[in-house]
Amino acid sequence: MQNIEKINEEEAKKLLIELADKIAQYNHAYYIEDKPLVSDAEYDQLFNTNLKLEQKFPHLILENSPSKKIGAKVENKFAKVTHQVPMLSLSNVFDEEDVKDFLDRIKSFLRLDQFSPIFCEPKIDGLSFAATYKNGILTTGATRGDGYIGEDITANIKTIKDFPHKINNAPELLEVRGEIYIEKNDFTSLNQEQEQQGKDKFANPRNAAAGSLRQLDPSVTAKRPLKYFVYAIGSAKEELANSQDQLLAKFKELGFNVNEIGKLANSEEEIFSFYEYLKTNRKNLPYEIDGVVYKLNDFALQDRMGFIARSPRFATAHKFPAIIGQTKLLSITVQVGRTGTLTPVAELEPIEIGGVIVSRATLHNYQEIARKDVRVGDYVFLQRAGDVIPQITGVDLAKRSADATTFDPPLFCPSCNSKLHYVPEDIIIRCDNGLNCPAQNYERIRHFVSKNAMDIEGLGRKQVEFLIDKGLISNPYDIFFLKEKNEASLTKLENMDGWGKKSVENLFNNIEKSKNVSLPRFIYALGIRHIGEQNVKLLAREFGSYENFIAQMELLKENDPEIYQKLNNLDGIGDKMLVDIIDFFDVKENIELIKNLSEVLNIEDYKETREQSSLTGKIVVFTGSMPTLSRAEAKATAEKLGAKVAASVSSNTDLVIAGEDAGSKLKKAKELGIKIIDEAEWLTLVRDI
């Protein structure tokens, strides 16, 4: 990652675009597919780099910035549930200095003279949920989703053995929030069952819990050893408690499971002592934790602190450092991806790290292998922090044997044997044989049918491989004629190994259903290099319809300067992406495929709906000293209500809130005839909204 201090504005703009797309992909994999692509540590590093860039260049903040989003958008297979109170995620801190900064911000924001108690509790590594009770009866269970809309998992949540379906002495409306998880021993047993049944093993307990809870068939969920803790309230008709410690006691009284390991800290020293205690003893806990959550204990103070776009100001998560292990590197294999990129993968002597057996690790790229001087036969250090593919962080040179061998990058593609070329700006080696490369063609079809693209359920990795091997499909277009081909064949698909009448029938129904596709999904399904989910929405919004999109792409391919500039001006599309788009539409086979697909698909025009709040778009200015509010708290409240807070008064200003010694801004507001109110009127306005 580049040095943030030395980066210039143009470099920052490009990097922010790349980060937005990459983080969006990682969010979807983690929150929706329950298959994380990177470690927690790597994700946190990317997210914090994005934050630092935005702090340095605030005018470059993108509309699709990760700092504005929570989780990922929900899938269509579950009914949607709107969270009346958004389910925000927590910001992260990584060392004592970060924690001290967090505590200082609380003091400054609230103008406190002394330390306000902080409640500390373990950060369970599971799946967040919300459960709503009406008159004591459980009516709705939902996932976090994107923080605003989650998935309805009511039937599944009811299968958890000790989850209350009814609570006594409850308010008319109560929404509790917490974490669903699987204990370490249960996870080991579950993976043994998966292996015995010939199914894929779960990467870690968090993935197992998430995958279990998001089953379409509740009877499958019922067989999984799910447990839960509640730790927060979403909404209630009456106040249950005045503080976090009181709330947990109330939850316990109502019959919910709460984590008994928690501490009310009255000083920084007590906070750090509790963190060290949990870090040292987490291996003895029956469940996985990945840090400690710190919350301002007093709810009245929490309300004053409020929220930023994706997280509360009054709480944060102090993450544990990654777990390190050591094992032998047996070999290095090479994988060819959808866009031709070759990725080296370390094959390892199996080792248990944090309760998970690890036998493979990512090596990222060949430059990384050379930089770390990783050799086959070495004993390597592994880092794992809840990720599906751990990372090699270094080599134990003291254990290096004389026969440890360096790994030379291949000169020819292991799939199609075509000559490879090095792409220095991306630090990668690539095969440019496109659809003529079996590995790329396979991965491209896999991408085309994936959840975020055409979403054809029943075409997983094994099924796609089978259909290609049998010559039933050779490109995405063939999928839509699979039923006709099967009907004309002497050997029916349902009679082949791994298939049955019902699975084939469901597959054909899903293929038919996928023919109605939105423009963003269609563009994403094409698999254009560097063009992710967020970018396709920008393109779809710009062009509106498939016909216009294709017409504009033809102009772009012909180097039309007007369309090139129009796309380059889009907030989220960079030069590198434009080159990749041009390269894609310059390939004859791609144009033919798109034309063929357009004849069998109904590609729907792009439609966007935006929700407006009562103050959305209003420009307000605070000036002078407020009697009770800090400037930060006043600004936060305004932004929470949808207003934009400006630093100066202009003819575009809608409202000025003036305190003592307001000065020139107040004078200008009077001259322009802008509405002016004081702090008391502002607080009344806020309360009424």
Curated annotation (Swiss-Prot):
The record lists NAD(+) as bound by D40, A41, E42, Y43, D44, S89, L90, E121, R144, E179, K295, K319
Q: Which SUPFAM superfamilies match?
A: BRCT domain, DNA ligase/mRNA capping enzyme, catalytic domain, Nucleic acid-binding proteins, RuvA domain 2-like
List of residues binding Zn(2+) = C413, C416, C431, C437
Task: Enumerate the cofactors the protein uses.
Answer: Mg(2+); Mn(2+)
Name one matching Pfam family. Answer: DNA_ligase_ZBD
| EC id | 6.5.1.2
Cross-referenced PROSITE patterns: BRCT (PS50172), DNA_LIGASE_N1 (PS01055), DNA_LIGASE_N2 (PS01056)
Q: What class of enzyme is it?
A: ligase
Which keywords, in A-to-Z order, does the entry hold? DNA damage, DNA repair, DNA replication, Ligase, Magnesium, Manganese, Metal-binding, NAD, Zinc
Q: Which reaction does it catalyse?
A: NAD(+) + (deoxyribonucleotide)n-3'-hydroxyl + 5'-phospho-(deoxyribonucleotide)m = (deoxyribonucleotide)n+m + AMP + beta-nicotinamide D-nucleotide
Q: Which domain of life is it from?
A: Bacteria
Q: What function does this protein fulfil?
A: DNA ligase that catalyzes the formation of phosphodiester linkages between 5'-phosphoryl and 3'-hydroxyl groups in double-stranded DNA using NAD as a coenzyme and as the energy source for the reaction. It is essential for DNA replication and repair of damaged DNA.
Q: What is this protein called?
A: DNA ligase
**Organism from which the protein derives:** Rickettsia bellii (strain OSU 85-389)
Q: Which gene encodes it?
A: ligA
